[in-house]
Swiss-Prot record:
SUPFAM superfamilies: NTF2-like. Gene3D superfamilies: 3.10.450.50. Keywords: Aromatic hydrocarbons catabolism, Dioxygenase, Oxidoreductase. The gene is ndoC. This is Naphthalene 1,2-dioxygenase system, small oxygenase component. It comes from the Bacteria. Disulfide bonds: none annotated. Pathway: Aromatic compound metabolism; naphthalene degradation. Component of the naphthalene dioxygenase (NDO) multicomponent enzyme system which catalyzes the incorporation of both atoms of molecular oxygen into naphthalene to form cis-(1R,2S)-dihydroxy-1,2-dihydronaphthalene. The beta subunit seems to have a structural role in the holoenzyme. PANTHER family: 3-PHENYLPROPIONATE_CINNAMIC ACID DIOXYGENASE SUBUNIT BETA (PTHR41534:SF2), BLR3401 PROTEIN (PTHR41534). It comes from Pseudomonas aeruginosa. The lineage of its organism: Bacteria, Pseudomonadati, Pseudomonadota, Gammaproteobacteria, Pseudomonadales. GO terms for biological process: 3-phenylpropionate catabolic process. One of its GO terms (molecular function) is dioxygenase activity. The naphthalene dioxygenase (NDO) multicomponent enzyme system is composed of an electron transfer component and a dioxygenase component (iron sulfur protein (ISP)). The electron transfer component is composed of a ferredoxin reductase (NdoR) and a ferredoxin (NdoA), and the dioxygenase component is formed of a heterohexamer (trimer of heterodimers) of three large alpha subunits (NdoB) and three small beta subunits (NdoC). Belongs to the bacterial ring-hydroxylating dioxygenase beta subunit family.
Length: 193
């Protein structure tokens, strides 16, 4: 199956390429491995075991990026600018700083304790042709509750790359989170997606 981006003008070249990658992959074992990786990772993040998440799920060479795409119609665009904007563009050291901040007893944002629930859906998995990289695309909903009246819900699409290490375990080497809002409707974005 092919997507003709000349005819389907709303489909970007990147999206067409990613669709084709996952459409041609029919490996059930790979799909199960991807689902297991993501649900274990979500569990660690839900219970706020951030150091364990860094140690067991995240590679030291990780690129962790949250972007927002242009949401205006083509007729409203007056200038040729990037259609994406970085919200976060972090490496392992920066993730370590964020984890340390979350675990700091002085962090007022965690008193009272914040509760998280993550829903990961539409998981698709495919192997990279040239490398031992597992590509995983998924949709994510994060529900964050603090006190009775502070509830935030985040929706996003994630494109991950997981690499198998020397110990045989896969770790996250790249995560691109496509956040569909240009302006956050939440108190803050101090979460890991």
């Amino acid at each position: 199956m092919m997507i003709n981006i000349q005819e389907d003008k709303l489909v970007s070249a990147h999206d067409a390429e990613e669709f084709l990658r996952f459409f041609n992959s029919g490996d059930e074992a790979l799909q199960q491995e991807a689902t297991t990786l993501l649900t274990r990772e979500a569990h660690l993040l839900d219970i706020q075991a951030y150091r364990a998440w860094l140690e067991h799920c995240v590679d030291s060479e990780v690129k962790y990026q949250i972007i927002s795409r242009e949401l205006r119609s083509a007729s409203e665009r007056r200038y040729q600018l990037n259609e994406t904007m970085n919200i976060f563009n972090e490496n392992y050291e920066q993730l370590e700083v964020r984890v340390a901040h979350q675990l700091d007893p002085q962090n007022w944002g965690n008193s009272p304790k914040v509760r998280f629930t993550r829903f990961i859906t539409n998981i698709q998995a495919a192997m990279d042709e040239n490398e031992d990289l597992l590509h995983i695309r998924s949709n994510l909903i994060v529900h964050r509750a603090r006190r009775g009246n502070q509830v935030d819900v985040f929706y996003a699409t994630r494109e991950d790359k997981w690499k198998r290490g020397e110990d045989g375990a896969r770790k996250l080497v790249q995560r691109l989170i496509d956040y569909p809002e240009r302006t956050f409707q939440t108190h803050n974005v101090m979460i890991f997606m």
